[in-house]
Regions:
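Edge beta-strands of extracellular beta-sandwich domains
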Residues: 238-265
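Short strand-edge motifs at loop-to-beta-strand transitions and within beta-strands
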Residues: 218-222
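N-terminal targeting or regulatory segments adjacent to alpha/beta-hydrolase or S9 domains
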Residues: 277, 282-283, 290, 298, ...
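Sec-exported extracytoplasmic/periplasmic mature domains
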Residues: 14, 18, 115-116, 290-291, ...
Length: 346
C-alpha cells in the first residue's frame, strides 16, 4: 500500500508539471535496495552520522556505497546538521556535547565530504536558524532545535555560519572561531580561522604566528601559545578579525552543559572499572553477556507494554518505528546510539 501511494503521488506530480523532476527525502533507516527509491526521478537522504549516532566517516561511506551500487542514479543530501548552543565551548569537542566547537568539527567534515563528491545533485544543511521544537529539552534550551547556523533570535551567527560564508560568499571577510571561548586551560590552544581570501596571517599580542595559504578547503588551523591574556588578530587581505584568550587554571563550567543526573562533562567522567554508563553505545553494551541479558529483558518489557496498549500510541520515536522493517542495516545503525541518546529520543 505504501509503495502504491508513492507511485500515485509521483504520477500526479508529473501530470501537474511534466517539466519538474520528482524527489523524496529518505531517512537513514531506509535500505538503499528499497524499491521506494525507484519511484522518484532523483533520490535524497537525511543522514545524521556523527550526531545522533555513529561517526562522521559513515556519511562518506554511505554515499560512496550508494554511488558504487547505483552510479547512474542521482543521489542528494537532503538533511544534515548538529545542535550547538554558542554558550558551550570545548578544547575536546565530542559528538553530543552541544558545543559550538563540535558543530564546527561536524560541518568542516561535511563540507569536505560534499566538495569531494561532485556527483551529489544537491545538499541541504539543516538548518539556517534555530527553530521551535516543542518536544525537545536538551542542549540547555527548552523547546528549541539548535541545529541552526544562527540563533533563534537571529542575534548570533554561530562559528559554523562563517564556514559556509567562506564557500558561498564573494564578499571578502575573515572570521576567527572561538571568540566566545575565552577561558582556556590548555597551554597551547587550537584556533580555527575561516575566510574566502587566499591567505591568512594570525597575530598573538601583535606577534605573527605565521601566514597560511588557502589549500583545498577554506579552513586554517593555528596552534597558539596560551599564557596570561592574549589578543588574537586574524588578517586576510584588507579584512581583520579580533578575539581574546585568557589562560585559566580550572575549566570554566559555564562552557559545559550541566544536566542533573547525567555525566556528560569530559573532565568529570569517572566510570568504575567493570561498569558501563549511559554514555556507552548500544553496540558496546550488547558485546557483553550481561548486556545481552539486559537487552532481552527490555525487549520483553516493550512487548508487554505494546500488548497492554493494544497498538495505541506510545509517543516519541516508538510511534515512528511502528511498521518499520527491521533489517541488518537498521540494527547496525542502532548499535551506534548511546543509551543516553536513545532515552532522549524515546
Amino acid at each position: 500500500e505504501l509503495l502504491e501511494n508513492h507511485r500515485a503521488l509521483n504520477e500526479l506530480a508529473h501530470r501537474l508539471d511534466p517539466t519538474r523532476p520528482t524527489t523524496m527525502a529518505n531517512v537513514f533507516m531506509l535500505e538503499i535496495t528499497s524499491p521506494i527509491l525507484e519511484i522518484p526521478d532523483v533520490n535524497s537522504y537525511n543522514l545524521y552520522f556523527g550526531w545522533y549516532l555513529g561517526e562522521l566517516d559513515q556519511n562518506d561511506d554511505f554515499f560512496d556505497t550508494y554511488h558504487a551500487k547505483y552510479p547512474d542514479r542521482c543521489i542528494g543530501f537532503s538533511e544534515y546538521g548538529a545542535d550547538a548552543n554558542p554558550a558551550y565551548q570545548s578544547a575536546h569537542p565530542e559528538k553530543g556535547d552541544y558545543t559550538e566547537t563540535y558543530q564546527c568539527v561536524y560541518h568542516e567534515h561535511m563540507a569536505k565530504m560534499i566538495a569531494d563528491r561532485p556527483w551529489l545533485w544537491a545538499t541541504h544543511v539543516w538548518n539556517m536558524f534555530d527553530f521551535a521544537a516543542d518536544g525537545r529539552d536538551e542542549g540547555g534550551k527548552n523547546g528549541e532545535n539548535q541545529k541552526g547556523l544562527v540563533t533563534f533570535d537571529r542575534k548570533i551567527k554561530k562559528d559554523a555560519f562563517y564556514l559556509y560564508k567562506a564557500y558561498w560568499s564573494k564578499q571578502p571577510f575573515v572570521h576567527t572561531c572561538g571568540s566566545r571561548y575565552v577561558d582556556r586551560t590548555e597551554d597551547v590552544t587550537k584556533v580555527t580561522v575561516y575566510t574566502n581570501q587566499p591567505q591568512v596571517e594570525l597575530f598573538a599580542n601583535g606577534k605573527s604566528l605565521g601566514v597560511q595559504q588557502k589549500g583545498e578547503y577554506p579552513f586554517f588551523y593555528f596552534d597558539v601559545p596560551n599564557s596570561g591574556e592574549t589578543t588574537l588578530t586574524a588578517k586576510a587581505g584588507d579584512c581583520t578579525d579580533e578575539s581574546h584568550l585568557r589562560h585559566a587554571n580550572e575549566p570554566n563550567r559555564d562552557y559545559v552543559l550541566q544536566e542533573e543526573g547525567a555525566v556528560i562533562n569530559w573532565f568529570e567522567i569517572e566510570t568504575p572499572p567493570g561498569y558501563m554508563s549511559i554514555n556507552d553505545t548500544i553496540g558496546d553494551i550488547l558485546a557483553t553477556t550481561r548486556g545481552k541479558l539486559l537487552a532481552l529483558r527490555i525487549v520483553q518489557m516493550v512487548r508487554a507494554n505494546m500488548k497492554k496498549n493494544k497498538g495505541g500510541s506510545t509517543g516519541g520515536m516508538a510511534d515512528m518505528a511502528k511498521g518499520m522493517k527491521i533489517n541488518k542495516s537498521l540494527i547496525d545503525m542502532g548499535k551506534g546510539f548511546t543509551v543516553k541518546r536513545v532515552c532522549m529520543m524515546a
